[in-house]
Curated annotation (Swiss-Prot):
Coiled coil: none annotated. Binds DNA as a monomer. InterPro entries: MUG/TDG, MUG_bact, Uracil-DNA_glycosylase-like, Uracil-DNA_glycosylase-like_sf. It comes from Salmonella gallinarum (strain 287/91 / NCTC 13346). It catalyses: Specifically hydrolyzes mismatched double-stranded DNA and polynucleotides, releasing free uracil. HAMAP family: MUG. CDD domains: UDG-F2_TDG_MUG. GO terms for biological process: base-excision repair, AP site formation. One of its GO terms (molecular function) is uracil DNA N-glycosylase activity. Gene3D superfamilies: Uracil-DNA glycosylase-like domain. Keywords: Cytoplasm, DNA damage, DNA excision, DNA repair, DNA-binding, Hydrolase. It holds the Pfam family UDG. This is G/U mismatch-specific DNA glycosylase.
Length: 168
């Protein structure tokens, strides 16, 4: 099982959809070699070097955390059922209320729409908040996502810059 990496007072919690099989087998988030999460958060400015999946706990040193909408591992996120995403959305709200990070970044538009019963959303900062926590939707860094790495970095950097502007 892939455990959450959470603590009070984080700048951001990145929320994936669910663990892939590589993550389920290793116990580390975003563990598949084709997943660009670790590269993207480094290039966007969240970490001072590119961490490896097995160093995930070090995210806390950078005031970042990770969680997921659904615990059940799958080969592809499309295998996750709607009821799992809706339940995951409710559970995620509780986690965010408990830990109160400055921002929540949900990684994937469809996951956000289904988990939070929203439709037709755009990338970036959302008008909704969970308490004082800003909610962002960023592209999923999965290797199955065709978006170019440069575009991922640009989207994630926008969040990093917004946090810096708030003194975080």
């Amino acid at each position: 099982m892939v455990k959450d990496i959470l603590a009070p007072g984080l700048r951001v919690v990145f929320c994936g959809i669910n663990p892939g099989l590589s993550s389920a087998n290793t116990g580390f988030p975003f563990a598949h070699p084709a997943n660009r999460f670790w590269k993207v958060i480094h290039l966007a400015g969240f970490t001072d070097r590119q961490l490896k999946p097995e160093e995930a706990e070090k995210l806390l040193d950078f005031r970042c955390g990770v969680t997921k909408l659904v615990d059940r591992p799958t080969v592809q996120a499309t295998e996750v059922k709607l009821h799992e995403l809706r339940s995951g959305g409710r559970n995620l709200i509780e986690k965010i209320e408990d830990y109160q990070p400055a921002a929540l970044a949900v990684l994937g538009k469809q996951a956000f729409e289904q988990g939070f019963s929203q439709r037709g959303i755009a990338w970036g900062k959302k008008k909704i908040a969970i308490g004082a926590t800003m909610v962002w939707v960023l592209p999923n860094p999965s290797g199955l996502n065709r978006i170019k790495t440069e575009k991922l970095v640009e989207a994630y950097r926008e969040l990093d810059q917004a946090l810096i502007m708030r003194g975080l």
